[in-house]
Amino acid sequence: MELAYNFVQVVQDAILRPDFTSVLSIFFLSTVNELTAVLPYTVILSSQLLFIQDPFSVAMFTKLLLFIAIPMGIGAAIGSSLIYGLAYFGGKPGIEKFGKYFQLSWEDIKKMESKFKGSWYDEILFLALRLVPLLPSFPVSAVAGILRMSPVSYFILTIIGFTLRMMIMFTFVGLGMGTLAQ
């Protein structure tokens, strides 16, 4: 029980009083979590605003963006790049070998790929999927790799998507707590 309390206290300090150490911790946590997909860390990090004493302000929003959301977005992009890379380079052999277990063939992938032309609205769709707070990133990263999305677009849109996802959660929780306090 004490270990759980200490964990909550450490996370709470990292969110409510961020410093260089907490930035590195958030970066490392998000990178590792994208590789292992253990925790819904977007929810865990944003729930720490429930313990906030001060009103949710522009200054706090800016601090959360700079010290929490951006490092988390960069870390998550680095972590999810491994899944993307495996799907990008091993997608066809993997689908041909294991696709029968999922009732999926390379022809199915080609049909799906023909619907995506590599235009701006494909990237908007990818970004929208990255914004959904409870959607696991593994399938989104794998599909982006299999469909051979540009690595530069993937990395940039993943950083933007994860950063905005975190800020959306902070905004909902922060403004929700402000409403409850009134």
Residue ranges and their predicted role:
Residues 1-26, 56-135, 146-152, 158, ...:
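Membrane-interfacial helix-loop-helix
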Residues 23-52, 132-143, 152:
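Transmembrane helix boundary and interhelical junction motifs in multipass membrane proteins
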